[in-house]
């Protein structure tokens, strides 16, 4: 993202624009190789500079040093132009045959899985994501496996296959712990907590949400705090513990205020609804 500046190194839109201009204006683009050009494309997209995206794609293609780099450019070009799924599948099949093409093939297959997930074609999503995951296992791409498992977990949840979602989510957690990926852990803990709550194992869900909240507090991630506290409030409400639910929502509201951010309206609406539920019991 380019809309914040903080300890995590994110930059403002103005800073991002200056960086892009420095790297791409005039003859500066001649010093940009294909990998760097591809990394700059998402930034150009966030800045809304479609002409620069096209320039970067053209430059990346002309600067590609081998078939694998050419394949990465083709992948980015297909994505940018909203190509058909068949075109992505064809690219994946072609690049998998290259000596160093497996990471690219896995990435393309993963993208196909995401396209099917967004179209709610869950069986197809599972097929292509699993193919991507098998390649990532072969090349020991642990970070890539995290993404594969996240898609399979989401796919299972959409189909109410919660036991399978729990299996994928647990494996994802284990890999993230080994990678010491704190932000990924925060998100994955909340995902698995949601699955546990759906299965009715509330003690496990509370423990996982609490761990996610602790990480979100350490990372000063207000979105992570919101997800964890909202989940804990859900469980409190399900168990009839409205005071605890209200406490979590109140803490969530204050967190947004502390960060100088507008609190989502559902927090206030839910607090108001819980207050109405709690008030009669206090008067009895």
Describe the function of each predicted region.
Residues 1-105, 271, 275-284:
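Flexible inter-repeat linkers and adjacent short helices
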Residues 14, 51, 85-89, 123, ...:
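Residue register within tetratricopeptide repeats
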Residues 23, 44, 60, 64, ...:
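Eukaryotic all-alpha helical interaction scaffolds
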Residues 32, 66-69, 104, 144, ...:
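Structural signature of alpha-solenoid helical repeat junctions
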Residues 40, 53, 60, 88-95, ...:
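Tetratricopeptide repeat
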Residues 42-45, 72-80, 103-118, 143-158, ...:
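Conserved alpha-helical positions within TPR/SEL1-like repeat arrays
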Residues 48, 82-86, 120, 140, ...:
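Residue-level detector of the short coil/turn that links helix A to helix B
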